[in-house]
């Protein structure tokens, strides 16, 4: 016969379970865990050994030293030994130095060099041997290196050598605590101002790019009139015109390793010109939109281009093969630069980011997101392991290899199209409103501002600098402008520090804005 189980509500079952649990544990509910005497003794002995181990074995008396043998030097001052625990409150006396001197200048003697690991019995005896609280408080106020004695004991002065050592140590500490001189802001290096030397006309459209050849004999420009022109650097006369692009030429560069000129344009084409025959010998196909810039690797035969299709491409110069497609930017890539050291490729984009790339893997190493607006220009310092980027909000300086932020160069409130720097530390920024600012690279001091007049035949609104470059001697600065001209600037040879002083006021607390 099956016994019928009485059904209860969930509420009743829960409370029954709670009651059973309460009845099971109510005997010791809320009581502390019972203390295990044996483990407590071991714990205290270990704690005393660890915390007071260095002072457990004090210098021994004369008699004990004599028993140990003649190799231990006798102590001229008697010491007391800690007795075993006899159940009475005994005050103990420390009259000599211990293995770890209480302060600087306390010399080690033969007996203080004796160090042994404390035993458990010694650790237990230390519980009674520790000084009283009154003595501890008195010891805290006593100077380092002094001795502690019972009242009425004969005074013994410190040795003269010890006193001198203590005084020297205290003087050293005081000198370390002296107020240091406030750091001074570095003063900008004086640079002579640059003045307009020559205006070269010949293009029929905006001059968008410029490059100087390695021999410093001529330079090349690309224009919106779809031509590439080669000019004599000394006289400014036109030497050669190259036609082949069917849209604006946006980038030109001359190889230092071969007699080749590379160009790119808004017609998606990248061309390699042989300057011995003045003909195109290679095309590099792959970009899906306008190509905005290009650069050559300084040590290997590699060409890097950047495009409006949000990618940068790495090409083998000789085989025309696309080695890598650097994808990751979310908007047009406006500028690209190469260097021999890592990271070997740097790109700036309209998506406001700068990317440092691993050339071998074809992947991003670092992405810099500090800019708030499009990054249209990047320049690498020829000597320092640093670079600068230009954007309408700021010019920013960075450190390689990981893109550490250095400083902002504020004041050029326009769309910055181009940057150039020379070995003297002169940074040039050119903007779309025709203004050119010159900066001291180290301090960020803006020592000159130039706004050249628009040349006849152009509208006043056609006042913009699209590209700039120093020649190889760094004595001339070339700018490619929207008034269809190339302007050549030179340093003012008559300027001195007296005629053009550095008008610089350091900011006491320079605000570090990212």
UniProtKB/Swiss-Prot annotation:
Which PANTHER family does the record associate with it?
PLEIOTROPIC REGULATOR 1 (PTHR19923:SF0), WD40 REPEAT PROTEINPRL1/PRL2-RELATED (PTHR19923)
Which ranges does the UniProt record give for the WD repeats? 202-241, 244-283, 286-325, 328-367, 370-410, 411-449, 460-499
**What organism is recorded for this protein?**
Rattus norvegicus
Q: What are the BP-aspect GO terms?
A: mRNA splicing, via spliceosome; positive regulation of G1/S transition of mitotic cell cycle; protein localization to nucleus
- List the CDD domains hit by this protein, alphabetically: WD40
Instruction: Look up keyword Transcription and say if it applies.
Output: no
Q: Which residues carry this modification: N-acetylmethionine?
A: 1
Job of this protein = Involved in pre-mRNA splicing as component of the spliceosome. Component of the PRP19-CDC5L complex that forms an integral part of the spliceosome and is required for activating pre-mRNA splicing. As a component of the minor spliceosome, involved in the splicing of U12-type introns in pre-mRNAs.
Which family does the UniProt entry place this protein in?
Belongs to the WD repeat PRL1/PRL2 family.
Residue span of region Disordered: 56-76, 140-159
Q: How does it assemble?
A: Identified in the spliceosome C complex. Component of the PRP19-CDC5L splicing complex composed of a core complex comprising a homotetramer of PRPF19, CDC5L, PLRG1 and BCAS2, and at least three less stably associated proteins CTNNBL1, CWC15 and HSPA8. Interacts (via its WD40 repeat domain) directly with CDC5L (via its C-terminal); the interaction is required for mRNA splicing but not for spliceosome assembly. Component of the minor spliceosome, which splices U12-type introns. Within this complex, interacts with CRIPT. Also interacts directly in the complex with BCAS2 and PRPF19.
As stated in the Swiss-Prot or TrEMBL entry, residues carrying the post-translational modification Phosphoserine are: 119, 201, 391
| Superkingdom classification of source | Eukaryota
Q: Where in the cell is it found?
A: Nucleus; Nucleus speckle
A single GO CC term for this protein reads: U2-type catalytic step 2 spliceosome
Q: Could you confirm whether the keyword Ribosomal protein appears in this record?
A: no
Gene behind the chain: Plrg1
This protein's UniProt keywords: Acetylation, mRNA processing, mRNA splicing, Nucleus, Phosphoprotein, Repeat, Spliceosome, WD repeat
This protein's name: Pleiotropic regulator 1
């Amino acid at each position: 016969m099956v016994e019928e189980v009485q059904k209860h509500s969930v509420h009743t079952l829960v409370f029954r379970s709670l009651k059973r649990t309460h009845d099971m544990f109510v005997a010791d509910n809320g009581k502390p865990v019972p203390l295990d005497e044996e483990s407590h003794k071991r714990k205290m002995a270990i704690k005393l050994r660890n915390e007071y181990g260095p002072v457990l074995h004090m210098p021994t008396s004369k008699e004990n030293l004599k028993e140990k043998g003649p190799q231990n030097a006798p102590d001229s001052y008697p010491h007391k030994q800690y007795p075993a625990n006899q159940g009475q409150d005994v005050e103990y006396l420390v009259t000599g130095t211990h293995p770890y001197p209480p302060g600087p200048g306390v010399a080690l003697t033969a007996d203080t060099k004796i160090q042994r690991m404390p035993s458990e019995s010694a650790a237990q005896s230390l519980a009674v041997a520790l000084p009283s609280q009154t003595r501890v408080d008195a010891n805290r106020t006593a100077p380092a290196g002094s001795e502690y004695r019972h009242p009425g004991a004969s005074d013994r002065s410190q040795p003269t050598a010890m006193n001198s050592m203590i005084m020297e140590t205290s003087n050293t500490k005081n000198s370390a605590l002296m107020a240091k001189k406030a750091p001074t802001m570095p003063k900008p290096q004086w640079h002579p101002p640059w003045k307009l030397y020559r205006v070269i006309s010949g293009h029929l459209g905006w001059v968008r790019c410029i490059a100087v050849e390695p021999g410093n004999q001529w330079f090349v420009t690309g224009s919106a009139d779809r031509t590439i022109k080669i000019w004599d650097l000394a006289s400014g006369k036109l030497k050669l015109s190259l036609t082949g692009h069917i849209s604006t030429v946006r980038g030109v560069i001359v190889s230092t390793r071969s007699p080749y000129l590379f160009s790119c344009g808004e017609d998606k084409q990248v061309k390699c010109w042989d300057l011995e025959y003045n003909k195109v010998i290679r095309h590099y196909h792959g970009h899906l939109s306008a190509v905005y810039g290009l650069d050559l690797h300084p040590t290997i035969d590699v060409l890097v281009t950047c495009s409006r299709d949000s990618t940068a491409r790495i090409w083998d110069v000789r085989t025309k093969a696309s080695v890598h497609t650097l994808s990751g930017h979310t908007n047009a890539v406006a500028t690209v630069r190469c260097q021999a050291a890592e990271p070997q490729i740097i790109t700036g984009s309209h998506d406001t980011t700068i990317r440092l790339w691993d050339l071998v893997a074809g992947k991003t190493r670092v992405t810099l997101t500090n800019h708030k607006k499009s990054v249209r220009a990047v320049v690498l310092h020829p000597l320092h392991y640093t670079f600068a980027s230009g954007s309408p909000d700021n010019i920013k300086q960075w450190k390689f290899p990981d893109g550490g932020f250095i400083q902002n160069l504020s004041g050029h409130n326009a769309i910055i199209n181009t940057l150039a720097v020379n070995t003297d530390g002169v940074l040039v920024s050119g903007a779309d409103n025709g203004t050119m600012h010159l900066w001291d690279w180290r301090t960020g001091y803006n020592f000159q501002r130039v706004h050249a007049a628009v040349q006849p035949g152009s509208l006043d609104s056609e006042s913009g600098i699209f590209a700039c470059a120093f020649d190889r001697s760094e004595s001339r600065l070339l700018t490619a402008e929207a008034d269809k001209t190339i302007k050549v600037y030179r340093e003012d040879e008559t300027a001195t520090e007296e005629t053009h002083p550095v008008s610089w006021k350091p900011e006491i607390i320079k605000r570090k804005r990212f």
